[in-house]
Amino acid sequence: MVTDKGTIKFVLYTDDAPITAGNFIDLCGENFYDGILFHRVEPGFVIQGGDPYTKAPGKEHLHGTGGSGKNIRLEKSPKLRHDTEGTVAMARSNDPNSASSQFYITLAPTTFLDNPPGYAVFGRVTEGMDVVKSIRKGDKIQSVTISDAE
């Protein structure tokens, strides 16, 4: 993932989260994330992006509400937890089966997010955690390339 601040690399857990990782891979293949802004930054907690409304001028009031138009069911594995910074997971509404395109990267261990119903972890940052920590609200995702998956 190339951002305004630099490159972030992460591994995707295609074996333990095939639906969620597959959804992310599909969206990347469509260049869905190119030009999308990080619309939520909570220091010490998460950065969040993936809302297509962030590409549309005048739609600031909708930031955080958009998606790809396709929801996926909540997919959890006991092996995949929010136990370290750099956890990559899908954001969703109160409906556990409402994940679509928005994702977040944790800035610290956030194990409370594993409490039922929880959130679908599908990856982990392997390089560029310094970039993750430098992201601010409004920083842009320039492109996302899938080169390999675990």
What is each residue range found by the language model?
Residues 1-150:
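Cyclophilin-like peptidyl-prolyl cis-trans isomerases
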